[in-house]
Amino acid sequence: MSMEETAVLLSIHPEWCQKIFRGEKTMEIRKNFPKDFQGQPFKCFIYCTKGQNAGFRMEPDGSLLRLDGTVIGEFTRDRVYEIAPLNHAPDDLEAQACMDRDQIWKYTHGKGYAWHITELKTYETPLDLAAFHLRCENALRWCNNGGCAMHIERPANGNCCGN
C-alpha cells in the first residue's frame, strides 16, 4: 500500500494546530497509532476541532475565516516512538511536543506514542469533513447504500482512516 493510498484523519485542538503550523510542535502525542502502518510513513490530515481557542485567518477582503471545525492541512508521519510505558523517544521529546512530562503522562495514562511531523502543508482553503471518504470493508454494514465509501460527518475519537 503506497502512502497516497494510506491516510489518517487526526482531531487536534486549535491551540495545538497553531503550534504545529508555527513550527513549534514537531511531535504529536497520541494514545495509539494504526498498527497496519507500523514502519512505513503515512499522510495525516489535520482536523482542527471546534473550540474556544479557535484559529482565524484574515482573508484578502478583510473578512475573518474561522479555521476550527475544518481540515486545515496535512503532514507525513515518518517515525513513531513508544513513549510509555517504555520511553524510546528522543531526549528533547517534551520540547518537540510542547508539553511537559506531567502533561504527557496525564494525557496518555501510561501508554502512548510520539508521532514525528514532517512535510507539513497548510491548505490555502480549509476542507470540510464531507470532502473525505471512509473506505468500507463491508459497504452494507457501514454505509447501507451499496457503495464502497461513506462521507465523514464528524471526526472519530481516535484515528480515522480514509482518503
Identify the residue ranges that each predicted region occupies.
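Structured alpha/beta reader/binder surfaces that contact nucleic acids or chromatin modification marks
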Residues: S2-N163
